[in-house]
Design a protein with these regions (language model features):
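Short proline/glycine- and polar residue-rich coil/turn motifs
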Residues: 114-121, 233-242, 274
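Short, surface-exposed loop/turn segments at beta-strand-coil junctions that are enriched for proline
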Residues: 129-135, 249-256
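Short, acidic/polar linear motifs in exposed loop/turn regions
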Residues: 69-71, 132, 204-208, 222, ...
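A short beta-strand micro-motif common to beta-rich folds, especially ectodomain repeats
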Residues: 63, 126, 137-148
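Beta-sheet-dominated interaction scaffolds and their linkers
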Residues: 39-71, 111-113, 182-199
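N-terminal signal peptide c-region/cleavage motif recognized by signal peptidases
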Residues: 32-34
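A short tyrosine-centered beta-strand micro-motif
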Residues: 139, 143, 257-268
Length: 286
């Protein structure tokens, strides 16, 4: 496949602004370890919490953790800062604490540690108190759950039992309605093995958190619409840049494109009066 010259622009004539309901969101991170993690089976719900709040407001939310395995597990719950990599992967290691959009100091988590028996569940609650006079914007925090085996060995407890698996519930807290400002800075094609993705790079220069929506349209040389693919619903953090990857060819998902020359048009709604629109050319070889 060959990517030809591209065009990225805003289309003011196609789409009027739709209000975007902002709240607090949660995404998940699961880390596997070879031995103990293989014996642990847990379910955390919800994995995304979206909240809208105002300065000085408070709320309490619940998260359910279920032990679907055959052995008791020990669960730790801690408030954590996090960020997104450019490809959208949640990042916890090396993230600066108390950044400009951190809400971690606003929350308290209880209980901090508990044992869950097989086929049982526990409820972890967090209380969030928004500071008075906080500036409007899209803030974030998370509750990180660490899972490990249960031991009654005092020596092992003294060494602090290794926690082998982690899942994070990501929490987005939207305060007010700051003005939205974003642009599509690039549109490219990424080939990975048998998969082909169209990748739009979006820069959010505002203080607002939004989620993307939209459509990729594939046109043949005659201008005929041969396929429409929805843009993934992914978070766009304040004052950040990220890639939005749209799968076009994926044999595992039975997505194929016949050989030929195509025009690719991507339209993304981020809550602006106009859609973000990018165009590029795609050549599919035999």
């Amino acid at each position: 496949m060959d990517l030809q010259p591209r065009l990225v622009h805003a289309d003011c004539s196609v789409h009027a602004q739709h209000p975007v309901v902002l709240a607090a969101a949660v995404a998940a991170l699961l880390m596997h370890a070879p031995s103990a993690a293989a014996q642990i089976s847990v379910e955390v719900s919800p994995l995304r919490i979206e909240l809208t709040a105002g300065p000085g407001s408070t709320t309490t939310q619940a998260i359910t953790v279920a032990n679907a395995g055959k052995d008791p597990i020990r669960v730790r719950a801690v408030a954590t800062d996090w960020d997104l990599a450019k490809d959208g992967a949640p990042q916890f290691e090396g993230v600066a604490e108390g950044g400009p959009y951190s809400a971690t100091s606003w929350i308290r988590v209880a209980p901090p540690e508990q044992v869950i028996e097989p086929a049982k569940e526990m409820t972890v609650r967090f209380s969030l108190a928004v500071p008075p006079g906080i500036q409007a914007g899209g803030y974030r925090t998370g509750v990180l759950f660490e899972f490990g085996p249960v031991t009654t060995n005092p020596a092992a407890r003294g060494r602090d039992v290794m926690f082998k698996s982690r899942i994070a519930t990501l929490i987005y807290v939207s305060i007010g309605q700051p003005a939205m400002a974003a642009e599509m800075t690039d549109l490219g094609v990424r080939n990975t093995g048998t998969q082909t993705q169209v990748v739009a790079t979006i820069r959010n220069s505002s203080r607002r958190y939004v989620r993307t929506r939209g459509t990729l349209v594939l046109y043949d040389q005659s201008g005929r619409n041969v396929r429409e693919v929805p843009v993934p619903d992914v978070p766009l953090l304040p004052e950040s840049e990220r890639e939005v990857a749209i799968s076009l060819v994926d044999p595992d998902k039975q997505l194929t494109v016949a050989p030929g020359d195509y025009k690719v048009e991507v339209r993304i709604d981020v809550g602006l009066p106009a859609l973000l629109v990018g165009e590029t050319s795609l050549k599919v070889l035999k």
